[in-house]
Amino acid sequence: ARQVAGSTPVADVLNSATASMLDPISGGRHKVFGSVGLNVIPQTSTIGSHLPRAFGLAFALGRAAGADMTSSWPLDSVVVCSFGDASANHSTAVGALNASAYCAHQGLPLPVLYVCEDNGIGISTKSPAGWVARSLSSLPAIEYAAADGTKPIELLDTAQRLAELVRTQRRPAILHLKTVRF
């Protein structure tokens, strides 16, 4: 966020988390995290509702580059979308991931990196052992990699590899990130 003059990322996050009227996205109407100036797609408390938006943006970026259209975003932009392991089973998330696989299967450019933050607990219930890994890794035409969030060097290497793949090959990928819930 430091690269955008006048941005106040810490204040913006705190204003969002407290539903402050100073929140630049919601104006205090809802706890929403996002930023137009920083190109952060708003993420709401409705689980998985932002995945279709991320898919749509990646689809539009892919189409714009192929159609030689102008865009306010760099042509090598990558959409990054994080979600929790409980969201991986929500209909909106499943729909976005399936649409991503469908487009990738057809060779359509879709520069999106999905990051599943898996702490093994879906809101208040345990996620079935192995379910998230199996369902995410089985999506056709989507690159899948897992990393342990408690091992930052390994995580950084995996994340950089996937981001570079998405950026250069313009196809979707999933980073399945094992995390710890405090």
Model-derived features with residue positions:
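Cofactor-binding active-site loop characterized by glycine-rich and histidine/acidic residues
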Residues: A1-L110, G122-A141
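Thiamine diphosphate
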Residues: G107-F182
